[in-house]
Structures are given as C-alpha cells and as structure tokens.
Amino acid sequence: MKRSASDSPLLFDLPLAPDFSQEQQLMKRGLKHIAGIDEAGRGPLAGPVVAAAVVLDQNDLPEGLDDSKRLTAARREALYEIILTKAITVSVASLSARSIDASDIRKAALEAMRRAVIGLTLKPCHALVDGRDVPPGLPCPGSALVKGDQRSVSIAAASIVAKVTRDRMMIRAGAAHPPYGLEIHAGYATQKHRAAIESEGPVPGLHRYTFAPIKGCFDC
C-alpha cells in the first residue's frame, strides 16, 4: 500500500519538539482518550524488548517531552516520574530474549506493544504507534507514525517510559552478570560487550542467540 506523505515525514517537516497536534486531530473526530505506544530494545544483543503505552491528560501535559534518544539519562529519569504522576494511565510490557529468539524481534516488539495497550486501566479510543506497523490484535484502532516519538507527545512519553524501564532492567542484569557491563551499554553490541561474549560465552535467557554475532558462533 502506498504511504502518504504524512506517514513518512522529511526531516524539515518534523517539529522542533513533539506536540499534541496528532492527538488533537483525533479528538476532533470525537475520540477522547488517545494512547501513545513505543518500544525500547530492538537492537541489543541481550535483554528484553520493552513497550509502553501512555494516555496523557490533555489539560495537564508534562513539559519537556521528547524522543527518549534525544534526552540525557538524568532527564529521562525525571520525566519518567512526572509522566507516571500526570498521565491518565500507563502500562508497560516486555518480551524476554527467549521469546525474541522464538519468533523474531519485529514480532516480539509488536506483541509487547499489544500487551502494553491491553494493560492500560482505561481502554483508549485510538493508539498512535511509533514506526511503520500497527500491532495486530490491539483492543482499539491504531495509526502508525514514522518518527512518532518526535511528532507526538504521547508517543514521546511512551518512549521515555519504555527506555527508563528497560535501562533499569539492564542495570539489574548487569549486577547479576558483571563481566558483560550491561549496566553501561544496556545490552547493545559495544566492543566491551562483544569481547565479553567471546571470552565468557552468551548467557542463556539473557542473550539473544538468533542475533549476530552470537548466532552460529556458539553451541546453543
């Protein structure tokens, strides 16, 4: 299906910071509660993929929301607490490395998103999803927004919640598995992480055995 220009924004089309205009367009159609959905952890060699769904209060929007990748860790942590306080409802879901290996990362990420929406205490009227895919099986209609975390404050809020949640999980994993430095790189393929995998081997249940360079290098 051909994508519209709004689905694939050019860099100069993006706002300086995400705003509430995407949500307002839906609200003009009578849709009251709009959920933003995003995930963290598609690319790492280790750990889960984590998705978050957030329904913001249009009358009490947190200030400073942005794509989590454009924020410092300290700023993400501060906004995370503000989002949990101000949002109407927030839900987080994750799929483990084993679940990722059993299917693939795209399917796992979409399933985590679906579960996050289902976990909301209030059923949204519509979901705005970061990326190009709407997860199958959502309990509400959804729209995919390319670079949505830079266009929609609801998606930006979800990106922050997902990122902070996953980073905290990887800090705990790092304490349990010191040689890998997971608390530093969150499971991504840094030189330190790759060297530790080569010397120590991958950890079952933690590392993604279907991801290169792990795939085919070890007896799993």
UniProtKB/Swiss-Prot annotation:
Manganese or magnesium. Binds 1 divalent metal ion per monomer in the absence of substrate. May bind a second metal ion after substrate binding. The keyword Cytoplasm applies. Residues 32-220 form the RNase H type-2 domain. GO terms for cellular component: cytoplasm; ribonuclease H2 complex. CDD domains: RNase_HII_bacteria_HII_like (cd07182). Its EC number is 3.1.26.4. One of its GO terms (biological process) is mismatch repair. It catalyses: Endonucleolytic cleavage to 5'-phosphomonoester. PANTHER family: RIBONUCLEASE H2 SUBUNIT A (PTHR10954), RIBONUCLEASE HII (PTHR10954:SF18). HAMAP family: RNase_HII_B. This is Ribonuclease HII. It comes from Brucella abortus (strain 2308).
